[in-house]
Amino acid sequence: MDALYEANDAEYALHMLTKTDDRSWYNMIRVGSTISLEAWDNKYKPNQDWNHAWGAAPANIIPRRLMGVEPLTPGFGTARIKPQLASLEWAKATIPTIRGAIRMEVENKADAYILKVTIPANMDAEVYLPLPRGKYTVTNNGAPVKVSRVKGEPFLYAGKIGSGSYTFVVN
């Protein structure tokens, strides 16, 4: 999963997270598991255990990659905010850190991309937004933002922010 996000293939990663066939996290729920299994299904490994850490990948992939929250310095002094929603239209998360919760809501509309983020006290964050096609404008709390394109990636760097609440809009 990490490799898919590193390769900027968030769409396939989203497909892996949300698929419902017998080789999926959804199937683990369907077969009655209350925690992650060792294999996708008993038919692939009849002697599997029903408490296996590898299957818990979505528990760290969703906050770190889909929502894009990762520490850049020890103790989350500086965080990176780099959501990769792919075709997902909306997501909301509260990510606990040692310095307090990062709260995020992302809307991925046809005409605008909206990132609402709250950074706790004693933390700052570098913000990345998806690179849209064609002409675009970026605002933060209604004011224009000068952004730079990230070399070799489909992202814009919107700058470093301190603690507080922000609404970034790309349209």
Q: Where on the chain are the PLM-derived regions?
A:
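Amphipathic alpha-helical repeat scaffolds
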Residues: 1-2
